């Protein structure tokens, strides 16, 4: 019976130790979301993937380290439309 209590205590300590980093990550994510302005119709898209898995020339003309955004209603001057984004049940222009 003592062994069961000790194992349960160790399990609870381990679960609590894992929960604290999760809470810290949740707090960081909440703080990051609060910093995003809601009145701006611009959405920043950040993508990361393994370069070896990406199809070559999947988007002609798109270069590495190019800043791309989903915009409504159209791209800004100097940007080119490369496709479409679907966000918040709306269609946005994918501009780089």
UniProtKB/Swiss-Prot annotation:
UniProt keyword Signal, yes or no: yes
Gene Ontology annotations for the cellular component aspect, listed alphabetically: extracellular space
Signal peptide (UniProt feature, chain positions): 1-19
Disulphide bridges: 68-96, 70-85, 75-95
Propeptide segment residues: 20-66
PROSITE patterns named in the record: DEFENSIN
InterPro entries per record: Alpha-defensin (IPR016327), Alpha-defensin_C (IPR006081), Alpha-defensin_N (IPR002366), Beta/alpha-defensin_C (IPR006080)
UniProt KW keywords: Antibiotic, Antimicrobial, Defensin, Disulfide bond, Fungicide, Secreted, Signal
Keyword Nucleus tagged: no
Biological processes per GO annotation: antibacterial humoral response; antimicrobial humoral immune response mediated by antimicrobial peptide; cellular response to lipopolysaccharide; defense response to fungus; defense response to Gram-negative bacterium; defense response to Gram-positive bacterium; disruption of plasma membrane integrity in another organism; innate immune response in mucosa
Membership in a protein family: Belongs to the alpha-defensin family.
Purpose: Probable antibiotic and antifungal activity.
Protein's name in the database: Neutrophil defensin 8
Organism: Macaca mulatta
């Amino acid at each position: 019976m003592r062994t069961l209590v000790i194992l349960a205590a160790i399990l609870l300590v381990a679960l609590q130790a894992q929960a604290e980093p999760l809470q810290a990550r949740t707090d960081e994510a909440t703080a990051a979301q609060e910093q995003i302005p809601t009145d701006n119709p611009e959405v920043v898209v950040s993508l990361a993937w393994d370069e070896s898995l990406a199809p070559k020339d999947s988007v002609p003309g798109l270069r590495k380290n190019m800043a791309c955004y989903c915009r409504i209603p159209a791209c800004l001057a100097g940007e080119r439309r490369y496709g479409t984004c679907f966000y918040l049940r709306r269609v946005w222009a994918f501009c780089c």
